[in-house]
């Protein structure tokens, strides 16, 4: 298993060239050298009394003589991530040299891991102006001819030297390898790790106490017996009034009151693992995670909190003394507050909680576990384009000035489409038509219609050549037809084909435009905007390292594509942006691109159709975050000089967690604002309204959903992805304010 687990993206290690002194010109001015004491091996004794005053070097990486080139088996520079890093191989192992903007928090979390008996990578903090730091930088400069990575390191006061854990991240497991790796012991370790994450409020792994999708990239399964090793840990302290503490209390009440029963929270974690690996660990796997979680909780509940607080303060003092690093002043009080919750749950249990039946605990249906034939490759993380149907007729009053709205959850009695994201959705004659998207890990080409009047889903029975399974495509309504363009398949192969669905005839047709004009290159998560009898395609991604900023127009009457010669302040290549028509121009905002798609944009541009010219405009207010594309819908009211326009957008993601706010962008003033959403008293009704309680999970934060707006001022969203893939319909009534 070890050989199968250790995955490195390329051959990491090359022969080390001779060192260069060129780094000296890129280093900060020399500072007085601080003598560094040799780190000693740290083994946590039963009675936790450790003197860390010498250095925060609690793991023994061993000495690395950066001047002795003979000891290196290889060194390789990588620009993966936002700052880049180096891999260094010696006889004693492989290590990572990197910058960490979170170095004090990461170091503190590793100390907590050791205290709780969890495995953590060996780590040492190296001062860049120390003798070791200077020698390290000069050595690494020899292979970094561009100086891009080494300059970043040299400008940091401290550098992180970390052991490379040989293994595989949890999200890379497949249906073949998962049964061998996800043993009872592994599941118990995952439970213990979740307890640690609850203590430090780290939602970026398995989100047992949060509503996001988590990040299985931050859980490594070591080749040494599938040992669970956390990576990229952090502490995010919260105020005492935050609902995180109450959610943890409720979770503990449920687990303690119903031992041996699968809780809804751990059932959701089980679903997330199924989603990524295609393998269902079953009820036994969930219960094993619960056992590991409670074992760590009980261990923490046995701590002498006064003594433990002194230990935490000594760690903090050591970080400050040795490396001038300071964790947040709220971190230690927050950790102690969480430990008191653990202590109270074990020693002063509350009355029993209701039965933890997964099926009754959440309004969200759990996805069907993937079969063994499910692809092991996850779909693209870039969400699909929004609905681009023509704007509906205006309601009796303008919605541009609305500050509040009511939301309601639509209860559907009959069978629903499978949960999905990155699908398309258009509104036609009062019905929502949903095509394609990713269902768990598989792109689909199924086609559903939802009748809002009857509250009923139906499969659309159609004739003709339907589009192949895809996600990230665009859908536009024109001339009694839905027009599908682009997208990508399971293997992230992008498309540039064009299909229509005739609503009256219920027929599909593949469109073959005339060859006179240039055809758009394959792409997904582009924007498709209807202006008169033309469809404008802007941007999109061809793959994670290739983004576009070109503008194509498809003229329906001529059945012809044209590449426009756009000039002016052209936006950077991007995907996932919102683009709408306003006064015969295209207004576009946001998106992301850059190497690997990690650059998020919060800029706005106007493309004047008459002159094919871009210019940038300034926006004000509270912007939506755009690490994942936004689902949006345009709205127009009035005519002539009194015409108003806005864009409504719900959800999205900051790259780590799905979001749950409703935004409005005023196209006249370029101002963004958040619209306060109020909850309906009953499902399917508006009724009287009450404020959403703090921590309320509905409407569930999400991304990758579709959004439509009807002529009465009601916005409807379907599906998307939160902590799980979703299959619900949520509505926002903009007239109930």
Swiss-Prot record:
Inhibited by staurosporine. Its EC number is 2.7.11.1. The keyword Repeat applies. Kelch repeats lie at residues 431-480, 482-533, 534-584, 586-635, 646-693. It comes from Physarum polycephalum (Slime mold). This is Actin-fragmin kinase. One of its GO terms (cellular component) is cytoplasm. Residues 358-397 have a biased composition (Low complexity). Residues 21-44, 347-397 are annotated as: Disordered. Belongs to the protein kinase superfamily. AFK protein kinase family.
């Amino acid at each position: 298993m070890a050989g199968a687990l250790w995955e490195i993206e390329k051959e990491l290690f090359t022969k080390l060239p001779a060192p260069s002194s060129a780094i000296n010109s890129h280093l900060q001015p020399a500072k007085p050298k601080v003598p560094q004491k040799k780190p000693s091996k740290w083994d946590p004794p039963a009675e936790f009394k450790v003197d860390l005053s010498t250095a925060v070097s609690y793991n023994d990486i061993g000495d690395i003589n950066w001047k002795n080139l003979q000891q290196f088996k290889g060194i390789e520079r990588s620009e993966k991530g936002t700052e880049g890093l180096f891999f260094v191989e010696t006889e004693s192992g492989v290590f990572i040299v990197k910058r960490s903007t979170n170095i004090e928090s990461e170091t503190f979390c590793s100390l907590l891991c050791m205290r709780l008996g969890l495995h953590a990578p060996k780590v040492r903090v190296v001062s860049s102006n120390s003798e070791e730091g200077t020698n390290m930088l000069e050595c690494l400069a020899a292979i970094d001819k561009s100086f891009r990575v080494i300059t970043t390191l040299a400008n940091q006061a401290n550098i992180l030297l970390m052991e490379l854990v040989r293994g595989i991240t949890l999200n890379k497991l497949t249906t073949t390898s998962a049964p061998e790796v996800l043993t009872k012991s592994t599941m118990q370790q995952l439970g213990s790790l979740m307890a640690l994450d609850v203590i430090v409020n780290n939602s970026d792994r398995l989100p047992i106490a949060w509503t996001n999708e988590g990040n299985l990239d931050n859980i490594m399964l070591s080749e040494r017996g599938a040992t669970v090793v956390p990576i990229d840990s952090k502490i995010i302290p919260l105020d005492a009034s935050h609902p995180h503490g109450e959610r943890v209390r409720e979770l503990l009440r449920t687990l303690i009151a119903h031992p041996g029963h699968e809780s809804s929270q751990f059932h959701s974690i089980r679903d997330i693992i199924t989603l990524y690996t295609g393998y269902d660990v079953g009820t036994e796997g969930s219960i094993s995670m619960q056992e590991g979680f409670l074992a760590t909780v009980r261990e923490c509940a046995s701590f002498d909190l006064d003594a433990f607080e002194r230990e935490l303060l000594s760690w903090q003092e050591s970080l400050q003394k040795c490396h001038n690093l300071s964790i947040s002043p709220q971190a230690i009080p927050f950790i102690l507050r969480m430990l008191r919750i653990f202590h109270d749950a074990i020693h002063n249990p509350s009355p029993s909680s209701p039965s933890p039946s997964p099926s009754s605990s959440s309004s969200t249906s759990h996805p069907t576990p993937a079969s063994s034939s499910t692809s092991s490759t996850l779909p693209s993380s870039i969400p699909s384009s929004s609905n681009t149907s023509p704007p509906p007729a205006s309601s009796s009053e303008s919605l541009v000035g609305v500050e509040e709205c009511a939301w309601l959850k639509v209860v559907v009695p009959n069978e629903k489409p499978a949960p999905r994201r990155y699908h398309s959705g258009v509104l036609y004659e009062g019905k929502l038509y949903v095509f394609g998207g990713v269902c768990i890990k598989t792109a689909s080409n199924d086609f559903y219609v939802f009748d809002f009047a009857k509250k009923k889903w139906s499969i659309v029975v159609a004739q003709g050549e339907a589009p192949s399974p895809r996600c990230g495509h665009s859908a536009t309504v024109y001339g009694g037809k839905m027009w599908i363009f682009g997208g990508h398949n399971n293997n992230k192969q992008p498309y540039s084909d064009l299909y229509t669905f005739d609503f009256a005839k219920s027929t599909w047709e593949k469109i073959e435009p005339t060859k006179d004009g240039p055809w758009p290159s394959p792409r997904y998560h582009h924007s498709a905007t209807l202006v008169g009898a033309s469809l404008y395609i802007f941007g999109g991604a061809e793959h994670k390292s290739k983004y576009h900023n070109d503008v194509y127009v498809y003229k329906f009457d001529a059945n012809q594509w044209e590449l426009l010669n756009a000039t002016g302040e052209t936006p950077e290549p991007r995907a996932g942006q919102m683009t709408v028509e306003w006064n015969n121009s295209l207004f576009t905002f946001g998106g992301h691109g850059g190497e690997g798609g990690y650059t998020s944009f919060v800029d706005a541009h106007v493309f004047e159709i008459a002159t094919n010219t871009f210019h940038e405009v300034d926006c004000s207010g509270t912007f939506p975050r755009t690490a994942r594309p936004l689902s949006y819908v345009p709205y127009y009211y009035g005519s002539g000089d009194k015409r108003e326009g806005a864009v409504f957008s719900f959800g999205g993601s900051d790259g780590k967690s799905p979001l749950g706010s409703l935004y409005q962008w005023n196209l006249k003033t370029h101002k963004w604002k958040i619209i306060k959403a109020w909850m309906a008293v009953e499902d399917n009704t508006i009724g009287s309204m009450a404020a959403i309680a703090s921590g309320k999970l509905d409407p569930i934060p999400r991304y990758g959903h579709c959004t439509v707006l009807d002529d009465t001022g009601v916005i409807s969203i379907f599906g998307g992805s939160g902590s799980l893939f979703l299959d619900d319909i949520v509505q926002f009534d903009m007239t109930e304010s």
